Amino acid sequence: MFVLVFVGCLSQASAQYDDWKHSGSMYLVTTSAGANLPASAVEKNFPLLIRLNKDYFDFSQAKPRGEDVRFSSNGKPLAYQIERWDAEGGNAAVWVRIPTIKGNDQQAIQMHWGNEKVSGESNGEQVFRTTEGFAGVWHLGDNLEDATSNNLDGVNRPDKPTTNTTGIIGDAQEFGVNKILDIRLTDVYDIIS
């Protein structure tokens, strides 16, 4: 478990983000006050789920679907995928690829928003890279698409569809004997029987 602390709006952003009106810092804490990872622990290219809530993020300052949101660490852009952005309901779920997480450390992650001139850069393929072992990633909300470049999208069987439900980290699908989701693995992988 990682601990993220969001610290409101900061006026300073790296030069790359000068055109963004707002920025804030979140801290990934792996010391004993947070995830309590040993100093020897190192995790590479970790997809970190960041949740935004109206209690600490003003959705009216960003574009309606979060298209102007960006993440960075030490001035370098971070790949991200917006899984859900509900400005009206006041919550969002964004996966951010963290290049390196070290144990017994505190790492700042900056979020930038408030730039009407930019279009969205949300890209699941850059967060969940197949070259790093992700064969498929399904967030299992209303959308059953694979977030990886393998495009192993899920398809509900018409006679036995899955149903939406609430999961541990957000929207989910309910499975069972009469609730089946098909994923065509044979399109990408050789299946040997």
Question: Could you describe each region identified by the protein language model?
Answer:
Residues 14-142:
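Alpha-mannosidase-like glycoside hydrolase catalytic domains involved in N-glycan trimming
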Residues 14, 117-179, 183-193:
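Extracytoplasmic low-complexity segments
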Residues 1-9:
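Bacterial N-terminal signal peptides
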